[in-house]
Amino acid sequence: MGRIRQTFIKRTGEELIEKFADKFTSDFEENKKAVEEVAMISTKTLRNRVAGYVTAKVKKMNA
């Protein structure tokens, strides 16, 4: 069983994937940098959670 992500993280991640799909890969470290570039996220923790969600989504789409 995994952790359930908050709606804000899911919504933000979905919007970023929709707008900037070409910037994201299945690598978390690269996605952290990409999220920092394209989104105005105030805290490191929130940035990492959004990047983790985006990474998981990209991995699912490529599988």
UniProtKB/Swiss-Prot annotation:
Keywords of this entry: Ribonucleoprotein, Ribosomal protein
Keyword Ribonucleoprotein part of the UniProt annotation: yes
Gene3D superfamilies found in the cross-reference section: Ribosomal protein S17e-like
Any one annotated GO CC term: ribonucleoprotein complex
Gene Ontology molecular-function annotations: structural constituent of ribosome
Pfam families: Ribosomal_S17e
Keyword Ribonucleoprotein belongs to the record: yes
InterPro entries per record: Ribosomal_eS17, Ribosomal_eS17_CS, Ribosomal_eS17_sf
Top-level taxon: Archaea
NCBIfam families cross-referenced by the UniProt entry: PRK01151.1
Family membership noted in the UniProt record: Belongs to the eukaryotic ribosomal protein eS17 family.
Stored PANTHER family: 40S RIBOSOMAL PROTEIN S17
Name of the protein described by the UniProt record: Small ribosomal subunit protein eS17
Species for this entry: Methanococcus maripaludis (strain C5 / ATCC BAA-1333)
